[in-house]
Amino acid sequence: MVWSDPLAMPAFVDHVSIPVADFERSAAFYDAVLATLGLRRRKQREGAIGWGPDDVLPPIFWIHAREPGHATSGIGLHIGFRAKDRTEVHAFHEAALRMGATDAGAPGVRPQYTAGFYGCFVLDLDGFKIEALVREGLPPRD
């Protein structure tokens, strides 16, 4: 089945968790970056923090302290966070760079992905590619 409205798709992924090398530094990074999208810390336990919107539990995005033997950087992982509008995309990008991310694609239109796609890309402190995007022309994210 092809979904004409990606926002109407059922949620197939419950949550994502990534290992980080410097837990405290990454926690501060994601606090600042995810706040631009209206996400906040929803749960915390020793060595793990989860972020999400106020009305969603369990949290959808987690970091955890990397254990010895885990991959040491990005490993090709790419996570896209849905923004409400272009303003949130820009705020996400600016906050990420301010917190030490590496630019991997400034905010802009990318018609090669889908019509109405506007987004940005950064590499987080561990080299994971994270993105903020809005799909213009579709109903906005709540």
Briefly describe each language-model feature range.
Residues 2-27, 79, 136-142:
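N-terminal beta-strand motif that seeds the catalytic metal site of vicinal oxygen chelate
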Residues 3-7, 52-91:
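Long, continuous compositionally biased terminal/linker segments
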Residues 17-60:
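Core segments of cupin and vicinal oxygen chelate
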Residues 20-25, 81-125:
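Vicinal oxygen chelate
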Residues 45, 75, 116:
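Exposed loop/turn and edge beta-strand positions of beta-sandwich/beta-sheet ligand-binding modules
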Residues 60, 131-132:
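Short glycine-/small-residue motifs
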Residues 114-115, 121, 132-139:
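Short beta->alpha transition motifs characteristic of CBS
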